Amino acid sequence: MSIKSGEAHTLDERFDRIVSIGMFEHVGVKNDREYFTIARRCLNDNGLFVPHTISGNITGNHTNAWIDRYIFPNSVIPSAAQVSQAVEGQFVIEDWHNFGADYARTLMAWRANFDAAWPRLSSRYDERFRRMWHFYLDSTCANFETRGLHVWQLVLSPGGVRGGYVAPR
């Protein structure tokens, strides 16, 4: 196993497996298709690409103004239509797993860890930051609980897995 970190468009290697965690929502709508094109170029013919992304129910090219300003500048939460359009003609969708309902618990665990660490952090961060971080975690948790946001993990193959892909769940 090798782990590569850096600018994907400069890679000139091929891999059996590529995993991309939390990247797609940050490439920008105009780069959606290129993101998958680069993955395809770097993947062996019998390889698998596993993109993991936060996602939403509505197609758009913007995000919440507060999130854009304070948390994830220039991010866009992709819809199923946007993902499908970017993948079309490049990959076979072998599996599309939505585990967003579980993510609310993750956010609340982060909040609990943050609160437990606050006595050590408070010398570096002010009360305004603490309130903003709580707002981010709590509001995002609510979006996952009400199913407005999701976490998707896809398994994509260049030409289809012979005999079909079996998801290990």
List PLM regions with ranges.
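Active-site micro-motifs of SAM-dependent methyltransferase domains
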Residues: 10, 25, 56
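Substrate-binding/catalytic lobe of Class I Rossmann-like enzymes that use SAM or dcSAM, i.e.
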Residues: 54-169
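Conserved Rossmann-like nucleotide-binding pocket used by diverse enzymes
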Residues: 4, 19, 50
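Conserved SAM-binding strand-loop segment of SAM-dependent methyltransferases
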Residues: 1-8
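A short acidic, Gly/Pro-enriched loop at the edge of an enzyme's catalytic core
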Residues: 9-19
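A short SAM/SAH-binding and catalytic strip from SAM-dependent methyltransferases
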Residues: 17-30
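A short glycine-rich, Lys/Arg-flanked "PGG" loop and its adjoining helix->strand segment in the class I
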Residues: 33-48
